Amino acid sequence: MSGIVTYGSYIPRYRIKPDEIARVWGENPERIKNGIFILSKSVPAPDEDVATISVEAARNALKRKKINPKEIGAIYVGSESHPYAVKPTATIVGSAIGVDFSLFAADYEFACKAGTAGMQNVKAMVDAGMIKYGLAIGADTSQGAPGDALEYSASAGGSAFIIGKDDVIAEINSTLSVASDTPDFWRREGQPYPSHGERFTGEPAYFRHVVNAAKMMMERMETQPKDYDYVVFHQPNGKFPTRAAKLLGFEEKQYKDGLITPYIGNTYSGSMMTGLSSILDVSKPGDHILAVSFGSGAGSDAFDITVTDRIEEMDRNKAPTIKKMLEKIKWVDYAIYAKYKKKIVLGDGIE
């Protein structure tokens, strides 16, 4: 059966606390933290973007498993903050890791589930015999307008999964998707920051799609919440995924290892995939995982995954674990954050 052969993630070391953002805008920091359950968020350095994050995540995946890059037949990078409007991120990644000229490559967009859409496609291509290995990446340097609620959560990071049939560490038993035209979050071409429906992003968008996708997967697999060792959802904040887990009947011990948004914020396309990476860092053979992404607009991808004995053969410490990256922090204030995120409009010739 096809599944995850190796994985890697990258989280920028720069962080800012919601308290600092609240201080600048005259907001109550305790109200903000209690409302979204985010204690800090990652900030990309001036030389970090979706391309560099994707390359680092892919290289970390290759550190854990010595795969010949020329055997990777497809690369799909999901993001809503690709560095170029016209020039693919996927080819940059391919060149950086040394893939062959014969390559399926594309950039995907579906808000925060573009990366998991890539996972589904490379799995289908592997199953069809079109490629030996496929690389799916979800990464973002997400945007939030100054003073907007999104500024407290929009962060940066990403994860890469190489999918194949040989030496699989986590079998993807099944995957499915749900989608509907739900205008909960959007950004038109040329606009620097997205707009959102505030509370409308909850019940009719996130919870409708995530909860139903999870239920449909459990119905298909004839499973119940108690049959899973771990569950991970898309994490726009710290509260939505915990509420979704409880609505479905999961316990804290099942979702706590994959819940990383309270420490790094919402990495958008990297969110659920990085939570899954965190679970794979600590999982053992036989562990059963339910993973559900979400993308505004709106849709969810669900995965039923079983960890194999091969994971014990992998030296997971050959690349930074999520725990290690969470511990590697350099704090910045709002001025540095605004500078790094290019929120300050400079005069001509000033850098």
Swiss-Prot record:
Metabolic or biological pathway, per its Swiss-Prot or TrEMBL entry: Metabolic intermediate biosynthesis; (R)-mevalonate biosynthesis; (R)-mevalonate from acetyl-CoA: step 2/3
Molecular-function GO terms, alphabetical: acetyl-CoA C-acetyltransferase activity; hydroxymethylglutaryl-CoA synthase activity
Signal sequence bounds: none
A Pfam entry, by short name: ACP_syn_III_C
EC number(s) per entry: 2.3.3.10
Keywords: Acyltransferase, Isoprene biosynthesis, Transferase
InterPro entries named among the record's database cross-references: ACP_syn_III_C (IPR013747), HMG_CoA_Synthase (IPR004656), Thiolase-like (IPR016039)
Binding site for (3S)-3-hydroxy-3-methylglutaryl-CoA: 112, 153, 201, 234, 243, 266, 296
Catalysed reaction equations from the record: acetoacetyl-CoA + acetyl-CoA + H2O = (3S)-3-hydroxy-3-methylglutaryl-CoA + CoA + H(+)
Gene Ontology biological-process entries: farnesyl diphosphate biosynthetic process, mevalonate pathway; isopentenyl diphosphate biosynthetic process, mevalonate pathway
Catalytic site: 80 (proton donor/acceptor), 112 (acyl-thioester intermediate), 234 (proton donor/acceptor)
Entry's family note: Belongs to the thiolase-like superfamily. Archaeal HMG-CoA synthase family.
Subunit structure: Interacts with acetoacetyl-CoA thiolase that catalyzes the precedent step in the pathway and with a DUF35 protein. The acetoacetyl-CoA thiolase/HMG-CoA synthase complex channels the intermediate via a fused CoA-binding site, which allows for efficient coupling of the endergonic thiolase reaction with the exergonic HMGCS reaction.
NCBIfam families (UniProt xref): HMG_CoA_syn_Arc, PRK04262.1
Annotated protein name in UniProt: Hydroxymethylglutaryl-CoA synthase
Species this protein is from: Thermoplasma volcanium (strain ATCC 51530 / DSM 4299 / JCM 9571 / NBRC 15438 / GSS1)
